From Swiss-Prot:
<dbReference type="InterPro" id="IPR037659">
    <property type="entry name" value="SMIM7"/>
</dbReference>
<dbReference type="GO" id="GO:0016020">
    <property type="term" value="C:membrane"/>
</dbReference>
<keyword id="KW-1133">Transmembrane helix</keyword>
<comment type="similarity">
    <text>Belongs to the SMIM7 family.</text>
</comment>
<feature type="topological domain" description="Cytoplasmic">
    <location>
        <position position="75"/>
    </location>
</feature>
<keyword id="KW-0812">Transmembrane</keyword>
<feature type="signal peptide">
    <location>
        <begin position="1"/>
        <end position="17"/>
    </location>
</feature>
<feature type="topological domain" description="Extracellular">
    <location>
        <begin position="18"/>
        <end position="53"/>
    </location>
</feature>
<keyword id="KW-0472">Membrane</keyword>
<feature type="transmembrane region" description="Helical">
    <location>
        <begin position="54"/>
        <end position="74"/>
    </location>
</feature>
<keyword id="KW-0732">Signal</keyword>
<protein>
    <recommendedName>
        <fullName>Small integral membrane protein 7</fullName>
    </recommendedName>
</protein>
Amino acid sequence: MIGDILLFGTLLMNAGAVLNFKLKKKDTQGFGEESREPSTGDNIREFLLSLRYFRIFIALWNIFMMFCMIVLFGS
């Protein structure tokens, strides 16, 4: 059960890290305009942009997960 959850999280993180969409940051508000709360789409966009910077750590996590799948979760 825990192996399935770890595998699901790893695959989801990999999918987010390798997306090649042209995600642009939201334009800043001009002077005198009211600032509003970021929408859910803005939060998802920021999360996907931050995942791109952690690709090396995601690769190390993948190697660790492969090791765990062979040693701990293998039957």
